[in-house]
């Protein structure tokens, strides 16, 4: 263990000092070591620093706990990444409230060329799980050099990790507790596999419980580490939306998949898109093009893209088949005749298909297939 690791870990144990204040101190003074070594001169080095903060730095208990944690880390192949460490995530370091210490167990480079965060509801539907799987599979075909970040939670998070491993993407799980446990325990097997192609990351020392407030802190790391955050499926309220909001505040790109307007677990995504807080994507090619990333091959059209929307009704499939044969598009009255669907039903079906990103309403009341 190094002096900087000890001092930085100790800083996180000082009561009453938040991440923004800690980041600001390190940026102005240079390092955690310098903060303690020049404690008596801090008021001159950092204008506005309070006497209360300076006094709080005299905390032997913090050093004792820091040394215990670093011994635990060394015994368990855990890296302690301080704020100025070359292996600390560069994208995260740019955030005002970045953690000054991260504990990491894994084998992948956290400063990969391309990093995305995939998040969503814990109560994922078959639609959301299929979306997540299809997106990552398509990404593997056109842009395989990506690090995938998520939170190891139930639902979309664990689906993202497992599918990433399936298609040989490195994937990192950001935890809301220490590295002495895996929560939820049902994901232990996946977490172990991730340490061979990715890893587990946290700002919390061992012994920290996965308390509610820690998940919000965890979400800022998920948002801060990435180039872009992708919300696959979310209710009107939830952690995925918090992550999306944080990503926006960090000036990250944010994307969301649309869903049916009446579906509870698509309400959050639809709201993000409606309020221009996330860009609508239908597939991996949409995403890669929006990011301006080079990609190897064109994603297959037609059936492959349509797999992102597996829950099509018989009427929706019929409309798609008709529009495939009429590439210039068709007016609603012509679709009613061709599909033998009453106009009272046709309007609602076309709206659902447009929300899914399958068709688009053009000038003159013409509907055209986008796939």
Question: Across the structure, where does each feature detected by a protein language model lie?
Answer:
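Short, positively charged patches
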Residues: 1-142
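Glycine-biased, small-residue-rich flexible motifs in mid-sequence functional cores and linkers
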Residues: 2, 82-371
